[in-house]
A protein has these predicted regions:
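Short, surface-exposed beta-strand-loop junctions and turns on beta-sheet-rich folds
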Residues: 60-62, 69, 86, 96
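A hydrophobic/aromatic-rich effector-binding and dimerization subdomain
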Residues: 7-13, 80-143
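Conserved metal-binding segment of the jelly-roll/cupin
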Residues: 63-76, 91
Length: 168
């Protein structure tokens, strides 16, 4: 996650070190993912424009507009870049995710579904909701540090995961 953080933080600092990263509209140089690798983070991104081909656990996926991809730390991912594209999303460390207020009984079916099928289409409405969540989290990240800033982001992250659960 630290290498990904270095690529992304230049444009989207969160102030939360390597635990929470916002992936802005333009994906970073995908050179880091040119070869199969693991990302020690939960990464959820949605394609706003363009397309990208990636392999997750040796299975190829074509990501196009209004598609979400969720990568878990156990996965082996490889990205093949195709033309212009815009993505928006987050990368969350395992430590940050473990601190969230998610009920494991609710998340196990979601986790199993993501492992089975990490890419899925979203409606325009769900795409907008996801982007609004990320925008709000980004706004909070750019505010001055407060005693409850991390707790606020944890709860928004939890709410986002529940929304993803309802969506898929």
């Amino acid at each position: 996650l630290a290498q990904l953080s270095k690529l992304i933080k230049r444009n989207n600092p969160t102030g939360l070190d390597d635990d929470f990263i916002i992936i802005g509209e333009n994906l970073p140089n995908t050179e880091l993912f040119k070869y199969p690798c693991r990302v020690d983070a939960l990464v959820a991104v949605i394609c706003l424009e363009g397309e990208l081909i990636c392999n997750i656990n040796l299975k190829e996926y074509r990501i196009t507009t209004n598609m979400m991809i969720i990568n878990t730390p156990e996965n082996i991912i490889q990205v093949k870049d195709i033309g212009n594209r815009k993505f928006y999303g987050i990368a969350v460390s395992s430590a940050f995710f473990e601190q969230s207020f998610l009920d494991a009984r609710d998340m196990i079916p979601l986790y199993m579904q993501i492992q089975k099928e990490p890419c899925f289409h979203l409606s325009n409405e769900d795409t907008d909701i996801f982007c609004q969540f990320i925008s709000l989290m980004q706004l909070i990240c750019h505010t001055q540090d407060t005693p409850k800033k991390t707790a606020t982001l944890l709860r928004l992250g939890s709410a986002l995961m529940y929304k993803i659960h309802d969506t898929i």
